[in-house]
C-alpha cells in the first residue's frame, strides 16, 4: 500500500502585485453594513488571485491584520446591445474579515 501524496501546488503563469490583485472596493449598502458592524470589507479582485494572495495584498496595502478571506466567482449577466444579446465578464469578489482592532477608513 503506497502512501498518499499531497497535491502539488498549482503553478501560475504570472505573479500579481498587491495593487493588481485588489481591483476596486465594493461599496454597497450591504457592504457598508458589514464594515460598520462586522469589520468585513468587500473587494473586486483579479480572477486568478487566491485567498492567500488577497490576504497578503490587503495586509500590505492597508497595514491591517486579516483574519479570514472568503471568495466568490460571480457570473456575468446577459446584456442587450441594440438587437444582439451579449454578456458582461465574469468577476471575482472577496470578503475580508479584519482583526477587531483594525479598520479601513475609506468605507
Curated annotation (Swiss-Prot):
Belongs to the universal ribosomal protein uL23 family. This is Large ribosomal subunit protein uL23. The keyword Ribosomal protein applies. The lineage of its organism: Bacteria, Pseudomonadati, Planctomycetota, Planctomycetia, Pirellulales. PANTHER family: 60S RIBOSOMAL PROTEIN L23A. Pfam families: Ribosomal_L23. SUPFAM superfamilies: Ribosomal proteins S24e, L23 and L15e. It comes from Rhodopirellula baltica (strain DSM 10527 / NCIMB 13988 / SH1). GO terms for cellular component: cytosolic large ribosomal subunit. One of the early assembly proteins it binds 23S rRNA. One of the proteins that surrounds the polypeptide exit tunnel on the outside of the ribosome. Forms the main docking site for trigger factor binding to the ribosome. Part of the 50S ribosomal subunit. Contacts protein L29, and trigger factor when it is bound to the ribosome. Keywords: Ribonucleoprotein, Ribosomal protein, RNA-binding, rRNA-binding. It comes from the Bacteria. GO terms for biological process: translation. One of its GO terms (molecular function) is rRNA binding. NCBIfam families: PRK05738.1-3, PRK05738.2-4.
Amino acid at each position: 500500500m503506497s502512501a498518499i501524496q499531497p497535491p502539488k501546488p498549482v503553478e501560475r503563469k504570472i505573479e500579481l502585485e498587491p495593487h493588481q490583485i485588489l481591483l476596486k472596493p465594493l461599496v454597497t449598502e450591504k457592504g457598508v453594513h458589514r464594515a460598520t458592524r462586522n469589520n468585513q470589507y468587500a473587494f473586486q479582485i483579479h480572477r486568478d488571485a487566491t485567498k492567500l494572495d488577497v490576504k497578503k495584498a490587503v495586509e500590505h496595502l492597508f497595514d491591517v491584520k486579516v483574519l479570514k478571506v472568503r471568495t466568490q466567482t460571480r457570473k456575468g449577466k446577459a446584456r442587450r446591445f441594440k438587437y444582439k444579446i451579449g454578456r458582461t465578464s465574469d468577476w471575482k469578489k472577496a470578503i475580508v474579515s479584519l482583526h477587531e482592532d483594525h479598520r479601513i477608513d475609506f468605507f
